[in-house]
């Protein structure tokens, strides 16, 4: 008998625990059931400290036998199948299906610039983090949530098991944008220092920091698999501006006077495309995944189309 998701009310519809800032037209029972069929994909095997929900074939002891392979120098002699040796006079090591756990670390940029945009970038990031966190918890992966603000990463949540999704969403709902400047590089470095072992790190950020390329380098240097969800708002991607304007930095309060005309906007879009391409190139060189997004993207499209196409989930 199919059980309802841990988060779903018996009557179906919108789960009652979901915070108000999680769109009730998206986070319904059907959406959650679809998320439960997904996994965050790994490019290479990751060895966790506990048994979890991911199945991998490896040497060792487990409940389910998988296959044999030829013995190699250094293999554990206890895993040799002596019955096969007696028949074939060849040494084989037994392989088993073992379920591993993986830590999924969600790094949420809560700098002041993330509060801008329509729809707000931070709100989109929180919703995306909620969906990714739900996938991980339903897969019995461990989930860690850290907020990047100021010069530090504030670790909010370390969870495991689908029943802990309530705590994850409550923590996400309580996150507010920072007041004042955020040093994204320092915050990312602080977050990297808190990582234990290898896993998957997902950064949700607008990357509006003069040294944002160093953020990717810092995270990639941890040895974890890194996913960059680069979130910009529609008015940043295609600004509808004209005339004489004063643009004010959301974090520092510094302003600059500009005249917006067709030439200015064309130059802006050219530089924007080159800026995003530089992140994509850097991510590829560091074996990270880079996904550029607009904050007006439908969440179902993000989870079931875009991130699957980019092989982030599957």
Segment roles from a protein language model:
Residues 1-57, 193-199, 209-211, 215-314:
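Von Willebrand factor type A / integrin I
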Residues 2-159, 190, 200-203, 210, ...:
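An amphipathic, basic-hydrophobic helix/alpha-beta surface used to engage anionic
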Residues 83, 177-181, 204-205:
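Short, flexible loop segments at the rims of nucleotide/cofactor-binding pockets, characterized by
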Residues 114, 172-176, 287-290:
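Short amphipathic alpha-helical interaction patches enriched in hydrophobic/aromatic residues
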Residues 123, 178-185, 270-273:
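Conserved phosphate-coordination/catalytic loops
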Residues 127, 131, 182-189, 277, ...:
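Short, contiguous clusters of charged residues that form electrostatic/catalytic patches at enzyme active sites
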Residues 156-171, 308-309:
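Short, electropositive alpha-helical surface patch
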Residues 164-199, 211, 232-233:
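Von Willebrand factor
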